[in-house]
A protein has these predicted regions:
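Basic polycationic patches enriched in arginine
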Residues: 10-11, 183, 194
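General helical secondary-structure elements
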Residues: 6-7, 22, 34
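Hydrophobic alpha-helical context, especially transmembrane and signal-peptide helices
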Residues: 5-7, 18, 147
């Protein structure tokens, strides 16, 4: 048997080690749930009635503007930061019409006390970083601190809807394709309030 030269052997071992670590990292990623509803709560925080009210609120916005908005609540994003997870969810769900690219995603990692708003490129002029930050700071964070998650999300949808309605009208189109890459998005940390998981 012919032995490999030491430098080649060391390089091969390093590549195997990197491949194993890369595979382990992907194995640890939180799965993206199927888009079975415009509101998906994997934390059992929202009541059935609260989820229904949010779904109806979002459905009305979509009927009026065509824009597609969804909310995802998870306990934690585990080893992945919420920015990366939010992008994976947005890319998988492909929110937004093909002609308009008008998708918005709200992600809440409850136990991590983090939230994020992903905005498709076509809505960046209406939902700027500053406007999204105000929605997070003024609507979501105060309500979340008081354990009023439904109220915070409803208020956020109202404000996002107001911004979306400022976008130029686009003819209705329901075909779902991969949207243009979104900007980094907005994220924030909220402080634990009563009843909020540590």
């Amino acid at each position: 048997m012919k032995w490999l030269p030491a430098p080649v052997y060391r390089r091969l071992i390093a590549l195997i080690f990197i491949a194993i670590n890369h595979h382990a990292a992907w194995a640890d990623l939180l799965p993206v749930p199927a888009l079975a509803s415009r509101v998906i709560d994997q934390t059992a925080t929202l009541t059935a009635n609260e989820q229904l009210q949010l779904v109806q609120q979002i459905a009305q916005l979509e009927a009026e503007t065509g824009a597609q908005l969804a909310i995802l609540m998870v306990p934690s994003t585990a080893t992945e930061d919420i920015a990366s997870y939010g992008k994976r969810v947005a890319n998988t769900w492909k929110l937004g019409r093909a002609q308009a690219g008008d998708g918005v995603l709200i992600v809440v990692a409850k136990n991590d006390r983090r939230m994020r708003i992903e905005v498709a490129r076509a809505l960046e002029s209406q939902i700027s970083d500053q406007r999204a930050a105000r929605i997070i700071d003024e609507q979501m964070k105060p309500a979340f601190r008081d354990n009023r998650f439904a109220a915070g999300l409803e208020a956020a949808v109202v404000q996002l809807g107001a911004a979306i309605r400022q976008a130029p009208a686009v003819a209705p189109e329901r075909k779902r394709i991969r949207p243009a890459p979104s900007r980094p998005g907005l994220q924030a940390i909220y402080l634990a309030g009563r009843g909020c998981a540590a």
